[in-house]
Regions:
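Short, charged N-terminal helix-start/capping segments
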Residues: 1-9, 66, 150-155, 207-209
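Short hydrophobic/aromatic-rich motifs at helix boundaries and adjacent loops
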Residues: 1-3, 21-27, 36-37, 51-53, ...
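Residue-level detection of beta-strand scaffold positions
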Residues: 1, 30, 37, 46-48, ...
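A solvent-exposed interaction/effector surface
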Residues: 51, 55-58, 74-280
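Terminal helix-turn-helix DNA-binding modules in bacterial transcription factors
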Residues: 3-16, 34-71, 98-118
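Sequence-specific DNA-binding recognition helix
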Residues: 13-33, 59-95
Length: 280
């Protein structure tokens, strides 16, 4: 049902549509949706539409009327009221002067029955050298987090939505494993953040802070596209490749003074991590 909603978000989605795609009755499909996601399909669809529309208002030269119409809202007034309830600001004001807002980032519910052999065949890992410029990163620290799940337990899983609302230098938020000199407290290695220009002077959300990162060289490791339910295997595949790879082969050594970077695992592009290196 989530996949169907994502693929048909700009269209009218009815209970019958969700029932058909899930092969359940409309009543039971709705019940399952609420049980697993904590909200009705209608609320889920509205929140997702509002968040998608906010990104359009931030990034495109588009009117509030056009966005409201294209996202299927019955009237501009109705859209404006819904936008204000969701984000606490008027859509016109937001499009003129974007500020960080808590975008809706829904949890993806994966079927419990998985085939552990789905990714057992030989798969390629692509590696390339990239240069990242000097930049600031707006981050939200944890306490003892060392990976995604412990981070979510400490600070919540909604941070990503807020970071997504901030226009990023790299086009999307990032997760970082910080080197020791950037940790505070020292036990918190893993953080989420968004890379921005060195002269960024926009709003810093409450509870967030800014760190400065120098221009640096990275090895980008990217796996092949994967089915969403196989995301754990996709991540492990890249971690194994990183452990086995010797950057000295191309004249580099690992750099422990810059953070390792994790991009959002998206099946259609493959899992991606960036590991810092330096010239030998």
């Amino acid at each position: 049902m989530q996949d169907y909603i994502s693929e048909h978000l700009s269209e009218e989605i009815t209970p019958a549509d969700l029932a058909k795609v899930s092969s359940f009755s409309p009543w039971y499909a709705r019940r399952l949706f609420i049980e697993h996601l904590g909200m009705t399909p209608a609320v889920y669809i509205r929140r997702l539409k509002l968040s998608k529309s906010a990104l359009r208002l931030r990034d495109e030269n588009v009117s509030v009327l056009d966005v409201a119409t294209e996202m299927g809202f019955g009237s501009v007034d109705g859209y404006q009221r819904a936008f204000r309830r969701e984000f606490g600001c008027n859509p016109k004001e937001y499009s003129t002067s974007p500020v960080p807002i808590w975008l809706f980032t829904p949890s993806l519910i994966i079927e419990r029955e998985r085939n552990d052999d789905n990714m057992s065949e030989i798969r390629n890992v692509f590696i390339q050298v990239i240069e990242k410029p000097a930049r600031k990163v707006i981050i939200k620290r944890g306490i003892k987090a060392t990976e995604y799940w412990s981070y979510c337990k400490e600070v919540g899983c909604d941070v990503w939505g807020l970071l997504t609302s901030i226009k990023s230098l790299s086009g999307e938020p990032v997760c970082l494993w910080l080197p020791e000199h950037l940790r505070k407290p020292i036990t918190n290695e893993y953080v989420q953040g968004v890379e921005v220009e060195p002269d960024y002077d926009g709003t810093i959300p409450e509870g967030f802070e800014v760190i400065d990162l120098p221009a640096s060289t990275y090895l980008l490791f990217r796996g092949e596209p994967f089915a969403e339910e196989n995301y754990v295997s996709a991540i492990t595949e890249i971690w194994d490749a990183e452990k086995k790879y010797d950057p000295a082969f191309i004249g580099y050594a690992w750099d422990d003074k810059n953070p390792r970077i994790q991009l959002e695992p998206r099946g259609e592009r493959g899992y991606i991590e960036l590991v810092p290196v330096k010239k030998i």
